[in-house]
């Protein structure tokens, strides 16, 4: 026989939907030379943050990933973090 569970179901939390910053502000462009902007989309370990974390749309997340990779190639951004 199965044991009856007395646990209550978890309360449902409202889902926060983030809007893409670049779709909201049409004049803001993604450029590999803008390291201040790109650093906000890189974790402290040097990884590119996921789309579900940043809240960007698919196209702008791809553009950010491409810009980060280009900035790494021209040594504007590090490939890894300097923290050990």
Swiss-Prot record:
Keyword Nucleotidyltransferase among UniProt keywords: no
Keyword Ribonucleoprotein: yes
Alphabetical list of Gene3D superfamilies matching this protein: Ribosomal protein S18 (4.10.640.10)
Pfam families, A to Z: Ribosomal_S18
GO cellular component, one term: cytosolic small ribosomal subunit
Disulphides: none
Single biological process term from Gene Ontology: translation
Molecular function in Gene Ontology: small ribosomal subunit rRNA binding; structural constituent of ribosome
SUPFAM superfamilies the record matches: Ribosomal protein S18
InterPro entries: Ribosomal_bS18, Ribosomal_bS18_CS, Ribosomal_bS18_sf
Keywords: Ribonucleoprotein, Ribosomal protein, RNA-binding, rRNA-binding
NCBIfam families on file: S18
Family recorded in the similarity comment: Belongs to the bacterial ribosomal protein bS18 family.
Function: Binds as a heterodimer with protein bS6 to the central domain of the 16S rRNA, where it helps stabilize the platform of the 30S subunit.
Subunit structure: Part of the 30S ribosomal subunit. Forms a tight heterodimer with protein bS6.
Record-given protein name: Small ribosomal subunit protein bS18A
Lineage per the UniProt record: Bacteria, Bacillati, Actinomycetota, Actinomycetes, Mycobacteriales
Gene designation per UniProt: rpsR1
